[in-house]
From Swiss-Prot:
BP terms from Gene Ontology: tyrosyl-tRNA aminoacylation
Molecular function per GO: ATP binding; RNA binding; tyrosine-tRNA ligase activity
Reactions listed under catalytic activity: tRNA(Tyr) + L-tyrosine + ATP = L-tyrosyl-tRNA(Tyr) + AMP + diphosphate + H(+)
Protein name from the UniProt record: Tyrosine--tRNA ligase
Residues that bind L-tyrosine: Y35, Y168, Q172
Assigned EC number: 6.1.1.1
Class of enzymatic activity (EC top level): ligase
């Protein structure tokens, strides 16, 4: 296991760690029980969480045992953000999200065998602590000076930070302590913005038990311009297919920038170093083929949505630009297309003409522009060329009875729903 950290670093999964030599020796000694936490701040995990799960998978494949903590307690509080106070969700909502995220994380790890992953909820032990317990047994070991020096707290001091969010570090440190006591957990992993919480937990364990535990954090994934990776114009890219369709998910990764795609492949793809280095050469020599982007999109969509949904997403991408049969697409895929295209909605009454549908869907700006597209042979309804500018849509034109696609030229596509 001596090369484990080297491999994780090559894959870009290590931003920082506690004493590297000590951590490397600890991992080499035998199976290590480690944990990563997921707070239920929404009903679904997103791309950022997948980075953590890739690290979990890599460690588990090397024989280490994962504890996946879903924060039923910490999710009621919220880790402080740079930009302001978090909205506090109702207990019932958080409890529902806990169950949803439990189901999601279990998909990405092995829950059988000697080093089977175990899912835990920090509500189970946190709820047993009284206010006096927390202040006396936990808070006593934390320096307010050091808590104030934390980057996120320092930035929030001027605008204000509640005692609730200020105290979040105590709860996360308590989690590490409880998992160490209950399961022998000696390593906490997380995103780079959790570094302060992780080291605080390690220090708390050292002070209260004398034991040495470890921490390892992954970098925050960004685009070439430095902004957060994992968001589109329509919002966050989720792993829940009800929130982000397989089509939208596949397209998101297919659009990865050339300058970043190899970085993303190393993090998210199970491909070997040799395969990824070969794709790096292809990207440099023939960037227009987008070989690395296709591999990235395929690998991650297979993982999150399954092979069949990935194939459906690819078929949809071909079909909307006239290179496949739209009527072969299933209703789920058709509806995801309309969502991605920002479909206009027909409220009822007589259906519009194709030209009217093109205007409504934003494919052309004006009816005269639509008529011109028809006259030039560049107007399409469900990939069929339109010859008559006064042709009116019918029931049969709505795919799966729901969506009609209009297109101008080769690439400008819109949708109308009913």
């Amino acid at each position: 296991m001596s090369d484990l950290l080297d491999d994780l670093e090559w894959r870009g999964l290590v931003a920082d760690s506690t004493d590297r030599e000590a951590l490397e020796a600890h991992l080499a000694q035998g199976p290590v029980t480690f944990y990563v936490g997921f707070d239920p701040t929404a009903k679904s995990l997103h791309i950022g969480h997948l980075v953590q799960l890739m690290l979990v998978r890599a460690l588990q494949e090397r024989g280490h045992k994962p504890l996946l903590l879903v924060g039923g307690a910490t999710g009621l509080i919220g880790d402080p953000k740079m930009t302001g106070e978090r909205h506090m969700n109702d207990r019932e909502v958080v409890a529902e999200w806990v169950e949803s995220i439990k189901d999601q994380v279990s998909k990405y790890v092995d829950t059988d065998g000697r080093n089977a992953a175990q899912i835990v909820n920090n509500y189970d032990w946190t709820v047993k602590y009284t206010a006096l317990d927390l202040l006396r047994d936990v808070g006593k070991h934390f320096s307010v000076n050091r808590m104030l020096a934390r980057d996120v707290v320092a930035r929030r001091l001027e605008s204000g930070i509640s005692y609730t969010e200020f105290s979040y570090v105590l709860l996360q440190s308590l989690d590490f302590y409880e998992l160490h006591k209950r399961y022998g957990c000696t390593l906490q992993t997380g995103a780079q913005d959790q570094w302060g919480n992780i080291t605080a937990g390690a220090e708390f364990i050292r002070k209260t038990t004398g034991d040495v535990v470890h921490g390892l954090v992954t970098p925050l994934i960004t685009k070439a311009d430095g902004t957060k990776y994992g968001k589109t114009e329509s919002g966050t890219v989720w792993v829940d297919p009800e929130l982000t369709s397989a089509y939208a998910f596949h397209q998101f990764f297919l659009n990865a920038e050339d300058s970043k795609v190899i970085e993303y492949l190393k993090i998210f793809s199970p491909r070997s170093r040799e395969e990824i280095e070969d794709l790096a050469r292809k990207t440099e020599e023939e960037p227009w083929r987008r070989a690395a982007q296709h591999c990235l999109a395929d690998d991650l969509t297979d993982l999150v949505h399954g092979v069949e949904q990935r194939k459906a997403a690819e078929a949809a991408a071909q079909a909307i630009f006239g290179r496949g049969e739209l009527r072969d697409l299933d209703e789920r895929t058709v509806l995801s297309l309309s969502d991605e295209l920002g479909a206009a909605h027909h409220e009822g009454g007589e259906y519009p003409t194709v030209v009217g549908a093109m205007v409504a869907a934003g494919v052309v700006d004006t009816k005269s522009g639509g008529r011109r597209a028809v006259a030039e042979g560049g107007a399409y309804l469900n990939n069929v060329k339109v010859a008559d500018p006064d042709q009116r849509l019918t029931d049969d034109d709505f795919l799966c009875g729901r969506v009609a696609l209009v297109r101008r030229g080769k690439k400008t596509v819109g949708a109308l729903t009913r």
